[in-house]
Each structure stands twice: as structure tokens, then as C-alpha cells.
């Protein structure tokens, strides 16, 4: 596999994983407020 493909896969994985994390952070902040 090329480094470019690995880089793109890692970026996609981070974006997909960041979605639920952002929602969880927003929910936690709303709960604290």
C-alpha cells in the first residue's frame, strides 16, 4: 500500500471518529450548563 492511501484512510478514520466525539462533548457541555 502507498503512504498516500494509508494517510487518506487515517484521515477518514479520524473524521468518522471525531463525529461522535464532538456530539458527546456538546452533550456534556450542555449537561454541565
UniProtKB/Swiss-Prot annotation:
A single BP term in Gene Ontology: photosynthesis
Keywords tagged on the record: Chloroplast, Membrane, Photosynthesis, Photosystem II, Plastid, Thylakoid, Transmembrane, Transmembrane helix
The way it spans or sits in the membrane comes to: Single-pass membrane protein
Q: What is its main location?
A: plastid
Compartmental location = Plastid, Chloroplast thylakoid membrane
What sections of the protein cross the membrane? 5-25
Q: What's the domain of life for this entry?
A: Eukaryota
Looking at the UniProt record for this protein, which Gene Ontology cellular component terms does it annotate, in alphabetical order?
A: chloroplast thylakoid membrane; photosystem II
Q: Does the keyword Plastid apply?
A: yes
Q: Does the keyword Electron transport apply?
A: no
**What does the record note on quaternary structure?**
PSII is composed of 1 copy each of membrane proteins PsbA, PsbB, PsbC, PsbD, PsbE, PsbF, PsbH, PsbI, PsbJ, PsbK, PsbL, PsbM, PsbT, PsbX, PsbY, PsbZ, Psb30/Ycf12, peripheral proteins of the oxygen-evolving complex and a large number of cofactors. It forms dimeric complexes.
Q: Which family does it belong to?
A: Belongs to the Psb30/Ycf12 family.
Relate the protein's function as given in its record: A core subunit of photosystem II (PSII), probably helps stabilize the reaction center.
Q: What is this protein called?
A: Photosystem II reaction center protein Psb30
Taxonomic lineage of the native organism: Eukaryota, Viridiplantae, Streptophyta, Embryophyta, Anthocerotophyta
Amino acid at each position: 500500500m502507498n503512504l498516500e492511501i494509508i494517510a487518506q484512510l487515517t484521515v477518514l478514520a479520524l473524521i468518522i471518529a471525531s463525529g461522535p466525539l464532538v456530539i458527546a462533548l456538546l452533550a456534556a457541555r450542555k449537561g454541565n450548563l
